[in-house]
């Protein structure tokens, strides 16, 4: 099992390069169609995209074992929310890869009787569940970091003898006796929360990259399952951006969100 997991990890870079090329073809095909390119050229781009997709499925053979090993490690995390989100995400990834392997067998002719549409829908459902868990984990980590940053700011303000913006010390908007002060106070709180969120994400590049990558990937299963039709152009662009970010995490491992 360990030997297969190591072999699977070595093929990740090739798979992600193929993924980037596949979604680049999808984006290019959409652009060619919009600009009235020749049908023959559009057909060649679609065929190249199909070949890259089949090649990716071959490179992903056995990735279920890697996902299961990751799920086994995540079970031992001390934080219960992270443990749940990461474990469920890896289990859904394992099921997604298993469905993907069945699809590869059908498309390669090894199992011609496979209902490819049914298995494709199953794989995208598991993919969607995995992404939802990933984004839930990201949201949880962001909340924790924002609370830590807010507490640190409060301690610094108290240490320097400063007042809290909008509080009674400043006599600012939003006091109980201020007519119509509720709306400006709410706007101020929202602005402070947005600034705090931006500060947290700027200070934690791995978390920022993970949020953007998962958000981009989310459009793919939503479109394929018919939950939100966004078109091949958006799918191609989001897939390409996500693939480039994934490649960056391989080139620079410190950009990968841990655990």
From Swiss-Prot:
Annotated GO MF terms: identical protein binding; protein homodimerization activity
GO biological process, one term: regulation of peroxisome size
Topology term for the membrane: Single-pass membrane protein
N6-acetyllysine modifications at: 43
Keyword entries, A-Z: Acetylation, Membrane, Peroxisome, Peroxisome biogenesis, Peroxisome biogenesis disorder, Transmembrane, Transmembrane helix
Entry keyword annotation includes Metal-binding: no
Chain intervals for the UniProt region annotation (Interaction with PEX19, PEX11G and FIS1 and peroxisome targeting): 211-259
Domain of life the protein comes from: Eukaryota
Any Pfam family: PEX11
Gene Ontology CC: one annotated term: membrane
Key word Transmembrane present: yes
Illness: Peroxisome biogenesis disorder 14B: An autosomal recessive peroxisome biogenesis disorder characterized clinically by mild intellectual disability, congenital cataracts, progressive hearing loss, and polyneuropathy. Additionally, recurrent migraine-like episodes following mental stress or physical exertion, not a common feature in peroxisome disorders, are observed.
Subunit and partners: Homodimer. Heterodimer with PEX11G. Interacts with PEX19. Interacts with FIS1.
Function: Involved in peroxisomal proliferation. May regulate peroxisome division by recruiting the dynamin-related GTPase DNM1L to the peroxisomal membrane. Promotes membrane protrusion and elongation on the peroxisomal surface.
Family membership noted in the UniProt record: Belongs to the peroxin-11 family.
Protein name per the record: Peroxisomal membrane protein 11B
Organism: Homo sapiens
């Amino acid at each position: 099992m360990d030997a297969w997991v190591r072999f699977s990890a070595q093929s990740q870079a090739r798979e992600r390069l193929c993924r980037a090329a596949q979604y680049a073809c999808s984006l290019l095909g959409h652009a060619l169609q919009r600009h009235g390119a020749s049908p023959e050229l559009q057909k060649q781009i679609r065929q190249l995209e199909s070949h890259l997709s089949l090649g990716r499925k071959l490179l992903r053979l056995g990735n279920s074992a890697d996902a299961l090993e990751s799920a086994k490690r995540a079970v031992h995390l001390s934080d219960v929310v992270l443990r749940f989100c990461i474990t469920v995400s890896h289990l859904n990834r394992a099921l997604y890869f298993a469905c993907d392997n069945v699809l590869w067998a059908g498309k390669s002719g090894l199992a011609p009787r496979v209902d490819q549409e049914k298995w494709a829908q199953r794989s995208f459902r598991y993919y969607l569940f995995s992404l939802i868990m990933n984004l839930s984990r990201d949201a949880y980590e962001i909340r924790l970091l924002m609370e830590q940053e807010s507490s640190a700011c409060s301690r610094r303000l108290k240490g320097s003898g400063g007042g809290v913006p909008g509080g009674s010390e400043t006599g600012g908007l939003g006091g109980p006796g201020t007519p119509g002060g509720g709306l400006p106070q709410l706007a101020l709180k929202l602005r402070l929360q947005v600034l705090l969120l931006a500060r947290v994400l700027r200070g934690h590049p791995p978390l920022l990259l993970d949020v953007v990558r998962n958000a981009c990937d989310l459009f793919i299963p939503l479109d394929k399952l018919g939950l939100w039709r966004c078109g091949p152009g958006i799918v191609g662009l989001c897939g390409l951006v996500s693939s480039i970010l994934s490649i960056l995490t391989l080139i620079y491992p410190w950009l990968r969100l841990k655990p």
